[in-house]
Amino acid sequence: MSQFTLLGFIALGGAFGACSRYLISELCVVLLGRGFPYGTLTVNVIGSLLMGILMSSLNQGLIEAGPWRPIIGLGFLGALTTFSTFSMDNVILMQHGEFIKAGLNILLNVALSITACFIGYQLMMKS
């Protein structure tokens, strides 16, 4: 596959990831409200779980590396997850004096995302 074609597939993965992020974030607002950045937390945890599954699958030889790692890992998951929005969510919470919520958001994003990535990786390990 040419580099130009690969870039096109990465961009397509990014488009699907960005649309998925938007839809998941909007669903979280509908279901859980705007009192906490649930959407950002949700996409970061889901993305981490999927990254663990992807990397374990690649390392185990369950899927061929080929273009899938950059298409899914960089394109789709790169657009689905978000560190900049996570950072801004915390700045806004702190500006409003919501330091406990900001701390909880930081703790949950880091702990749950790493745990989800570990679980996803372990799920794909060969027995």
UniProtKB/Swiss-Prot annotation:
Mechanisms controlling activity: Na(+) is not transported, but it plays an essential structural role and its presence is essential for fluoride channel function.
Main location: membrane
MF GO annotations: fluoride channel activity; metal ion binding
Membrane topology listed for this record: Multi-pass membrane protein
Keywords: Cell inner membrane, Cell membrane, Ion channel, Ion transport, Membrane, Metal-binding, Sodium, Transmembrane, Transmembrane helix, Transport
Cellular localization per UniProt: Cell inner membrane
GO CC, alphabetical: plasma membrane
Top-level taxon in the UniProt lineage: Bacteria
Pfam families to which the protein is assigned, alphabetical: CRCB (PF02537)
Position of the signal peptide: none
Amino acids binding Na(+): 78, 81
Catalytic activity line of the entry: fluoride(in) = fluoride(out)
GO biological process: cellular detoxification of fluoride
Cited InterPro entries: FluC
Chain ranges passing through the membrane: 4-24, 35-55, 71-91, 99-119
Family: Belongs to the fluoride channel Fluc/FEX (TC 1.A.43) family.
Purpose: Fluoride-specific ion channel. Important for reducing fluoride concentration in the cell, thus reducing its toxicity.
Entry protein name: Fluoride-specific ion channel FluC
Species of origin: Photobacterium profundum (strain SS9)
